[in-house]
Regions:
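Local sequence-structure signature of Cys/Sec-based thiol-disulfide redox active-site neighborhoods
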Residues: 2-26
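Generic recognition of short, well-ordered alpha-helical segments
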Residues: 18-22, 48-49, 69
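Short helix-capping segments at alpha-helix termini
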Residues: 28-32
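Thiol-based oxidoreductase modules, predominantly thioredoxin-like and allied folds used
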Residues: 33-44
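Short Fe-S-cluster ligation motifs
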Residues: 42-56
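A short, hydrophobic beta-strand/beta-hairpin element that forms part of a small beta-sheet core
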Residues: 55-63
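Non-catalytic, surface beta->alpha helical segment in thiol-disulfide oxidoreductase systems
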Residues: 62-85
Length: 85
């Protein structure tokens, strides 16, 4: 199974962003995911896109969710996503 890249767009000091990262990191080996954190603080384009929505979560470049992460929903999304690759 190919490893998926999970990108979390957030800001420094964002507690929801930290929560999402801390929820996924312990699952990364089991779920075969690489976690990529992107801070939007100094990027006007990303700030315009995601400024009020962080954390924003993408899987292999495809939008999954924003504000929160339900681990079971994430696992289901990941499984369906991989079936269509």
């Amino acid at each position: 199974m190919k490893q998926s890249v999970v990108t979390i767009y957030g800001r420094g000091g964002c507690h929801l962003c930290e929560y999402v990262v801390n929820l996924l990191v312990p699952q990364s080996d089991q779920l075969n995911i690489e976690i990529n954190e992107v801070l939007i603080d100094n990027n006007k384009e990303l700030e315009d896109l995601y400024g009020q929505l962080i954390p924003v979560i993408h899987v292999d470049g495809k939008y999954f969710s924003h504000f929160r992460l339900d681990l079971e929903e994430f696992k289901s999304f990941l499984e369906k996503h991989r079936q269509h690759q």
